[in-house]
């Protein structure tokens, strides 16, 4: 009966002849260290995520993938922003190695403040490119003082009020123009000109008055003799 490897034992999974984790633990000498490293990576990447990352590469590269994942996880705990690459670039690789040794020995990773790296060793600038704070101000403008800010706010407020007054005056002019109706050019030859709104309404009601029931006054009143007087409003 074949004994399970230390990685499968700590993960409580079956181990067979084609085990994925067994070849990845050959560079670690101690059995406890192999179990500690596997358990740490399973907690960091997840059990299924760890196996998928290892199986994504060919067989001869899987031990290197396991080791790279271990160093990257320890580097992210020490420096969450830059990781192991940032620690190597800034000259703080010793802290990443100390974190790996602590994981192999089953000890917690201690957080130590990183020394201030020089500007040439910084991978990520203090302010990202989409942050406007990295743009230098023009010295001729004199900066953004409170007086300049108040002046700009007052100017914008006056422009807004002026535009509102203009819109209100245009709306009032449009409302007044609806009170006067102008007949088409064909009717202007009859001498009617302009009619007020009251005259137009009276002309609309005329057909209804003519179609009213006959009350017996048609014989006494002649419509042709009635004089109509039109006045311009």
From Swiss-Prot:
Pfam family, one: LOB
Limits of the LOB domain: 3-109
Tree of life domain: Eukaryota
InterPro entries the record matches: LOB, LOBD
Protein family according to the UniProt entry: Belongs to the LOB domain-containing protein family.
PANTHER family per record: LOB DOMAIN-CONTAINING PROTEIN 38 (PTHR31304), LOB DOMAIN-CONTAINING PROTEIN 42 (PTHR31304:SF64)
Protein name: LOB domain-containing protein 42
Species per Swiss-Prot/TrEMBL record: Arabidopsis thaliana (Mouse-ear cress)
């Amino acid at each position: 009966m074949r004994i399970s490897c230390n990685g499968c034992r700590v993960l409580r999974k079956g181990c067979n002849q084609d085990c994925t984790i067994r070849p990845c633990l050959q560079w670690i000498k101690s059995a406890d260290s192999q179990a500690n490293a596997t358990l740490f990576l399973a907690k960091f990447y997840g059990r299924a995520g760890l196996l998928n990352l290892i199986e994504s590469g060919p067989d001869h590269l899987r031990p290197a993938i396991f080791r790279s994942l271990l160093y990257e996880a320890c580097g992210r705990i020490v420096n969450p922003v830059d990781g192991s690459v940032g620690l190597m670039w800034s000259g703080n690789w010793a802290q990443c190695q100390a974190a790996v040794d602590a994981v192999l020995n089953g000890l917690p990773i201690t957080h130590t403040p990183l020394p201030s790296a020089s500007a040439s060793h910084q991978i990520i600038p203090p302010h990202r490119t989409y942050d406007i704070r990295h743009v230098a101000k023009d010295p001729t403008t004199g900066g953004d003082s409170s007086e300049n800010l108040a002046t700009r706010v007052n100017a914008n407020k006056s422009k807004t009020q002026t535009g509102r007054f203009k819109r209100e005056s245009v709306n009032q002019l449009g409302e007044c123009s609806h009170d006067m109706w102008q007949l088409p050019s064909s009717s202007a030859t009859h001498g009617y000109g302009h009619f007020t709104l009251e005259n137009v309404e009276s002309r609309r009601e005329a057909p209804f008055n003519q179609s009213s029931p006959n009350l017996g006054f048609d014989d006494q009143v002649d419509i042709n003799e009635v004089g109509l007087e039109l006045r311009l409003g």
